A protein has these predicted regions:
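Cell-envelope/extracellular polymer assembly enzymes that use nucleotide-activated donors
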Residues: 3-5, 37
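Short hydrophobic beta-strand elements that form part
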Residues: 7-9, 40, 65
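Donor nucleotide-sugar binding loop of glycosyltransferases
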Residues: 13-17, 45, 102
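Short, well-formed alpha-helical segments that are part of the catalytic scaffolds
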Residues: 13-29
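Short beta-strand/loop segment that forms part of the nucleotide-sugar
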Residues: 32-45
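A conserved acidic beta->alpha catalytic loop
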Residues: 42-51, 99-100
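Acceptor/aglycone-binding surface of glycosyltransferases and processive sugar-polymer synthases
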Residues: 66-68, 72-82, 100-151
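Short beta-strand-to-loop acidic/aromatic patch adjacent to the donor-nucleotide binding site
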Residues: 88-100
């Protein structure tokens, strides 16, 4: 049986995470011969999280805490490093904790990964729900970040 780990970074938005986990749970229930675990990377949230109930289709949900707020990409890197030390999984699925990524697509990702285990399967978000101001500021942020990396 193949094991997939769903890695989700979260910062303060525990309610969205709970809704996301319920939605993921509903979407993985019909996937056969696959085991799902979930790693939640807490990006040093300032809001306490209430207990997360493990939905029935997950083998486990583990929260890994970062010492300081480092942002979404660092959370993913931290989670991947944490998982690399375990090596008891076959595939990794990265999802945002804000609900922007569609759990309905997990089945497609799993199907593709199982069809050809030697390849990496990636998905691209076609449409973001943020408005034009956010998109403009995000582009400026990316430019400034790239400028800092190159300098």
């Amino acid at each position: 049986m193949k094991k997939f780990v769903i890695l989700i970074p979260v910062y303060n938005d525990w309610e969205s995470l709970k809704k996301l986990l319920i939605n993921i749970n509903e979407n993985i229930q019909d996937i056969k011969n696959v085991k799902f675990d979930c790693i939640v990377v807490n990006d040093a949230s300032s809001i306490e999280n209430s207990e997360l109930i493990v939905p029935s289709n997950f083998s486990s949900i583990k929260i890994v805490n970062m010492n300081e707020n480092r942002g979404h990409a660092r959370c993913n890197a931290f989670g991947i490093k944490f998982l690399s030390k375990q090596s008891n999984f076959d595939h990794l699925i990265l999802m945002d904790g804000d609900g922007e990524d569609r759990p309905e697509e997990i089945k497609n990702l799993v199907d593709q990964a199982l069809k050809d285990p030697g390849i990496s399967v990636v998905a691209k978000r076609i449409k973001r729900s943020e408005g034009p101001l956010f998109q403009l500021l995000y582009r400026i942020h990316k430019y400034l970040t790239l400028f800092q990396l190159v300098s």
